[in-house]
Amino acid sequence: PWIPGWYGISNIDYYSSDELWLKSNLKANERFPGIWFMPGFWAEYGMCTEPSAFGSPMVFSEDSLPYAERIRTDISQADSLPRPEVRYDGMLPFVISRLRNNCDKIRQAGCEIRFAVSRGPFNIASFLRGTTELMVALAVDPERSHKFLNRITGFVCDWLSWQKECFKSIDGVLVLDDLIGFLGEDEFREYAIPVFRKIFMCTGAKVRFLHNDADGLITARSLKEMGVNMFNFSHNHSMREIRDLAGEEPESYVHGAAGH
């Protein structure tokens, strides 16, 4: 999300132009040669990407990040939530097309498409329903909340698997979900661990990368159960604090998000 402003173009130009998207990402790689960008050449449309597949209206502006408007305010509507077709619905085909159209030039620059990327089920659910409505439903209507999250989880698995099928160079998944940082211990164990375990196991990817830069202490204690071996956490937590909670297994790599 920082690339358009850094490169000196509007958000709309960045998201709508393959040429400007590629040039700005190549420039970032050239300007910071010692940095590994993960995922690198991220083709996405802000918070619109996954919710758009469910039919959420999308809002784009010149100076702010795209966002999706909610479509399900009542948890009783959980059973009617559609299962998107990831090859055709919303902005998802545009993500795949952008990467396909530019993959040769990306490789010519010495880079590769390595990650399948998706927002996580709680993040997507918060855009479909509203954050407050989602959190209240988790507390007062667990049966329907499980159904709602499970439907979204199935979609996330489909979406990650489709990306991996389209680009054989992919051997990592990145899932971004700050909403799990708002869950208490009991809610995290009941709702988050099972769905994230399913998501991180669904593609067989070697690198299983989770981003949560809200409160991450409960998350850090649960990384192994979730199937995570790389964790991007809030700059409000120290590396030592997260490492102590995550454990010392050599396959678990953790690093903090930069402050804003």
Cite the ranges covered by each PLM segment:
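N-terminal basic, low-complexity leaders that serve as flexible interaction/assembly modules and, when applicable
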Residues: 1-60, 147, 193, 197-198, ...
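Active-site loop segments of alpha/beta catalytic cores
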Residues: 1-14, 82-260
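Generic hydrophobic, aliphatic-rich segments that mediate packing or membrane embedding
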Residues: 21-25, 67, 77, 91-98, ...
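Bulky hydrophobic/aromatic packing residues
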Residues: 32-36, 75, 156, 178-179
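A contiguous, low-structure linker/loop signature
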Residues: 44-84
